[in-house]
Amino acid sequence: MSRTKGGTVTHARHKKVTDAAKGYYGRRKNTFKVARQAVDKANQYATRDRKNRKRQFRALWIQRINAAVRAHDEALTYSRFINGLSLAGIEVDRKVLADLAVHEPEAFSAIVDQAKAALPA
């Protein structure tokens, strides 16, 4: 019985890596060993940055809410606004608040007024 060398499987595996490395610079795009290292590192970055993206968007929403709150009332800060929301029983997440602040300022102003009224004087 002849030996099975698995050339088809190896070729398919190598092709998968080199296809993933398309667009890379230099030997990273066509040398299998270097391409595999580059693709592995790219996957590490992708995994890390999927986590970081959530943090960055939350920070962006907070900045937008803070700017809109201060534009509505200079004495009111972001933290006091969020406290007022919880005291008023308004359960709207930061993503929706930031979207309202950008696209529907009148509705956001109404929410700010309700949160401000709920704060202790």
UniProtKB/Swiss-Prot annotation:
Pfam families: Ribosomal_L20. GO terms for molecular function: rRNA binding; structural constituent of ribosome. One of its GO terms (cellular component) is ribonucleoprotein complex. PROSITE patterns: RIBOSOMAL_L20. Gene3D superfamilies: 6.10.160.10, Ribosomal protein L20 (1.10.1900.20). Keywords: Ribonucleoprotein, Ribosomal protein, RNA-binding, rRNA-binding. GO terms for biological process: ribosomal large subunit assembly; translation. The keyword Transmembrane helix does not apply. Binds directly to 23S ribosomal RNA and is necessary for the in vitro assembly process of the 50S ribosomal subunit. It is not involved in the protein synthesizing functions of that subunit. PANTHER family: 39S RIBOSOMAL PROTEIN L20. HAMAP family: Ribosomal_bL20 (MF_00382). Belongs to the bacterial ribosomal protein bL20 family. This is Large ribosomal subunit protein bL20. It comes from Dinoroseobacter shibae (strain DSM 16493 / NCIMB 14021 / DFL 12). The gene is rplT.
